[in-house]
């Protein structure tokens, strides 16, 4: 085991800024640019991805990303980073990022990425960041981070077992994306047939199917090691120590990007999050009706200033209930499949997070 500073095994480079790269160089479709909002914990968040043309990437070729690069954000949640895989090779580093490129052939980039995800290292990065109002990271702070390096063979073993768990999680996410597409197609097909008279039923509104409840907690209620899920207006789901709700529920963000989620189990909710618990029969149907109504609300209000969704907006979500209950059963079946895969992912993530520090500090070893 040897201890090295990150700067000793890598090249650190900040993204292009100032006169090098301007916002008007972004295009609708092109080569993806990784900015702070696209950086998760070891992964890339593709929602809201920006794009630039080939000529921009060629001009700023020093900022072209390669497989194995590790990318941090310079501001905000500075303990987050993403590892560039073969899929993202050739993408561009954004202005507000720091790229770490491993230059030591005895160091495995994926091992370093996992090492940087340990709670101890994330806390060290957060504590080292500068700035009174917003945490800020620079190459000096990042380069000073110490890494405990086992042999290259041991690095490979550790990274392989952790990445196998992440691969299973990613596979489940892809299945859930497919199930979400099937759900939406099924709902759109039903609503299309309603217009032509091919499907009969009756119209109602959300408040006829369920009470509309809001969470009571503020953001400080979150606890990273909490046992229960804590739903806020963010796309990310947090954890907390106490639950209030225990049912199949639809959760609608009352501000922010107005996202719609569903979950079965014990949880708590932020004060601007609406909780709908319609019972199992109409669970999937109300989820889809809410999803499409909120998306419609967002698209019709584009360009105007909409700070929040009111309880009245939620109460009046239109819901068509088909006479054929087989449709409801199909929707619920797909929705519950999604939740089963998500439960498996939660268990896999917990296993990975339990193994991670133990493998890194030598408490657990991998036999051949």
Residue ranges and their predicted role:
Residues 110-141, 277-313, 318, 367:
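Short, positively charged
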Residues 61, 87-88:
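Short, conserved secondary-structure segments in the cores of folded domains
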Residues 1-17, 144-234, 323-367:
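Non-catalytic DNA-recognition/assembly elements of restriction-modification systems
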Residues 3-44, 109, 115-118, 126-127, ...:
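Extended, non-catalytic scaffold segments that flank or surround catalytic motifs
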Residues 76-80, 258:
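Short, charged beta-turn/beta-strand-edge "cap" motif at the junction between a beta-strand
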Residues 7-23, 37-70, 206-247, 256-275, ...:
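Sequence-specific dsDNA recognition surfaces
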Residues 90-98, 130-159, 269-271, 303-326:
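A short glycine-rich beta-alpha junction/loop motif
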């Amino acid at each position: 085991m040897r201890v090295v500073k990150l700067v000793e095994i890598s090249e650190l480079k900040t993204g292009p800024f100032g006169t090098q790269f301007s916002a008007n160089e972004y295009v609708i479709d092109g080569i993806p640019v990784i900015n702070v909002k696209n950086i998760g914990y070891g992964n890339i968040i593709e929602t809201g991805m920006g794009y630039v043309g080939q000529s921009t990437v060629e001009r700023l070729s020093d900022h072209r990303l390669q497989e194995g690069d590790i990318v941090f954000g310079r501001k905000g949640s500075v303990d987050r980073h993403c590892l560039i895989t073969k899929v993202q090779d050739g993408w561009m580093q954004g202005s507000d990022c720091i790229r770490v490129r491993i230059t030591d052939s005895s160091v495995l980039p994926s091992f370093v990425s996992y090492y940087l995800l340990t709670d101890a290292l994330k806390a060290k990065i957060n504590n080292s960041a500068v700035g009174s109002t917003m945490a800020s990271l620079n190459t000096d702070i990042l380069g000073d981070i110490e890494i405990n390096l086992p042999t290259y063979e041991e690095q490979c073993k550790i990274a392989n077992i952790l990445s196998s768990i992440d691969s299973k999680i990613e596979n489940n996410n892809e299945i859930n994306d497919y199930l979400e597409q099937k759900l939406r197609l099924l709902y759109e097909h039903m609503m299309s047939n309603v217009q032509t008279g091919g499907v009969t039923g009756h119209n109602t509104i959300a408040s006829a199917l369920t009470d509309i409840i809001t969470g009571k907690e503020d953001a400080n209620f979150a606890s990273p090691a909490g046992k229960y899920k804590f739903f806020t207006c963010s796309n990310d789901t947090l954890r907390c120590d106490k639950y209030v709700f225990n049912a199949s529920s639809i959760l609608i963000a009352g501000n922010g990007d107005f996202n719609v989620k569903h979950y079965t189990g014990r949880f708590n909710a932020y004060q601007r999050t609406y909780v709908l618990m319609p019972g199992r029969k109409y669970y999937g149907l109300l989820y889809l009706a809410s999803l499409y109504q909120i998306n419609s609300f967002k698209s019709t209000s584009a360009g105007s200033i909409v700070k929040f969704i009111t309880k009245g907006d939620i109460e009046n979500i239109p819901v068509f209930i088909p006479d054929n209950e087989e449709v409801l059963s199909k929707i619920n079946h797909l929705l519950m499949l999604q939740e089963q895969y998500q439960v498996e992912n939660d268990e896999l993530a917990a296993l990975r997070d339990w193994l991670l520090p133990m493998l890194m500090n030598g408490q657990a070893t991998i036999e051949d």
